[in-house]
Amino acid sequence: MIGNHFKKKFSKRPPPGIIITAAKERIFENIISTYGTAAPVQTQSFKIEKYEILKPIKYNQKVKKGDVIANLKNRKIIAQFDGIIGKREFSEDLEVSKSSILINLEDTSSIYCDVDIPEIFVPFIKVGLPVDIKFSGYKDKIYKGNVDSFASRISEETRSLATRIKMDNLSGEILPGSFLEISIKYDVRKSLSIPDTSTIVEGENVFIYKVDEKNKALKTKITTGDRYIGFVEVLNGLN
């Protein structure tokens, strides 16, 4: 008797709870992913014979336009713009490298990166498009840039469009020659979104359950767009 009493009282499970979530507007965007090499916005090179040098040259130092970079026997090298002094050896010619040095003056306050955009994405490329930039030196940091310019025609050899990305680099964290990961954003828009787990796919159709003013769940057909981090874009079907 006791067993039957508890069986009748507790054998039925309560209906599962329903989680109701309001549709919200979110930012959706399409991304073109590519890569390239960082280059200084301005650079100037000077070949100097070692016997000319009167005073040691201070490398990796910031200079202003008009500063003296190097005092030589018969001349002075003057900075034509603000930048950083660097040195590069003539590694390809050992005889020359014994007697000469190559000084670089580089303006790294801004960095540019030339990339090739596949032909299929060319209609979306516009000057000023936002760009996210990453490089291995700071893996978790995202730098911001934009599309600065692009070629007037598509390359027949690569079927791509030469495009220049530019970014501020006042911190000096990105060095010329760094390998950069580029994400160009286009068609950035604010759209209605819902959790992707709330959708029901039946063949080519997508449905959700929408709660009406009487607190009843109505099966509703919707048209979806892109997906982004657990959410799906709703193009039609929800007001």
Residue ranges: model-predicted function:
Residues 19, 42-64, 75-91, 96, ...:
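Short beta-strand segments of a lipoyl-like beta-sandwich/carrier module
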Residues 126, 135, 141-207, 230:
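Structural microfeature recognizing short secondary-structure transition sites
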Residues 41, 56, 88, 105-108, ...:
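Residue-level recognition of beta-strand microenvironments
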Residues 45, 60-78, 94-115, 130-132, ...:
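Short hydrophobic beta/alpha edge segments that flank linear recognition/processing sites
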Residues 23, 36-38, 52-54, 85, ...:
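Conserved hydrophobic positions within beta-strands
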Residues 1-35, 39, 45, 124, ...:
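Acidic, gly/proline-rich low-complexity N-terminal segments at the extreme N terminus
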Residues 54, 166, 205-239:
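Acidic- and glycine-rich mobile interface elements
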